[in-house]
Structure formats: C-alpha cells, structure tokens
Regions:
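Short, low-complexity N-terminal intrinsically disordered segments enriched in polar/charged residues
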Residues: 2-4, 12, 19-46
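Exposed beta-sheet edge and beta->alpha loop/turn motif
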Residues: 91-141
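A generic structural signal for ordered secondary structure
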Residues: 20, 65, 69, 120-127
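Short solvent-exposed beta->alpha transition segments
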Residues: 34-36, 50-103
Length: 141
C-alpha cells in the first residue's frame, strides 16, 4: 500500500468513526410520532381551531371544549403570525405523565419561528391510541 493510499484509508476510517453516530437508524417510534405531530401542526398552522380540535386525541378533547380551544388559538397562536421555521429539538418517550393514566406517550419539543415571534418553543404531547400517535397536549412558550 502506498503512503497516499494508507493516508486515504486512515482518513476514511476517522471520518467513518466521526460519522458513525449519524448512521444509526432513528427510533421508529420517533419517526411515527413526529409524522403525526407534523400532520396535526399543519392543521393548527392554518389556524383552523375546529379541524385541529377534531384531529387531536381523546384526552385533548376531554380536557378542552371546542370553544376554549378556539379562544386559545385566537389569543395565543393567531398573534404569532405565519410559521417561518420549525425544527425538532428533542423527542422522548414515557409511560407516565403527572395526573394521567399510564400509557405510551411521546414528548416532542420544537424550536419554532413565526412572523411575529423570532424564536419560541412548541411542546407537543402525543399518546398512542389504537396503534396511532395522537396529539393530546400542545404548549407554546
């Protein structure tokens, strides 16, 4: 092996070690939960309180009336303006949430920018119901 070939092999090995964590497959639960969250957020981003309420999971609908959800959308989400950018910061899973029955929950934190708020956080809680992830909590910070 020539010196150039050896150097390239060593550099390739170092690059492979450096990039190895990126090559691991993402937890399939994270992909599924994030896809469900994106679908729900696409509805919420249209400021359609009725449709986002209907698309949410049963615990969401049990905790809020359609009227209260509509008021929250008008008071909190509407003033933020159009979505500019949304990036997943973290997705975690748990079976226990304070004040809730044990179940499969996904907690997804986003870094989000809107036209009228440069940087904020969105926190979504999803529950696996009937094999599907459904939004059961939504907070903007």
């Amino acid at each position: 092996m020539s010196a150039g070939t050896t150097r390239r092999a060593v550099l390739a090995a170092i690059a492979g070690l450096a990039l190895a964590p990126l090559a691991h497959a993402q937890d399939p639960r994270a992909s599924e939960a994030q896809a469900a969250a994106r679908a729900w957020l696409a509805i919420a981003d249209k400021l359609d309180a009725e449709a986002s309420y209907e698309a949410a999971g049963p615990r969401f609908r049990q905790a809020l009336t359609p009227s209260r959800w509509n008021d929250a959308v008008k008071l909190i989400r509407f003033p933020l303006g159009a979505l500019m950018q949304r990036t997943v910061n973290q997705t975690t899973f748990t079976t226990k949430l304070p004040g809730q029955p044990d179940s499969d929950y996904a907690l997804i934190a986003y870094r989000t920018s809107w036209a009228n708020k440069n940087v904020g956080r969105e926190l979504l809680t999803l529950e696996r119901v009937g094999g599907k992830w459904q939004v059961v909590g939504y907070v903007i910070q």
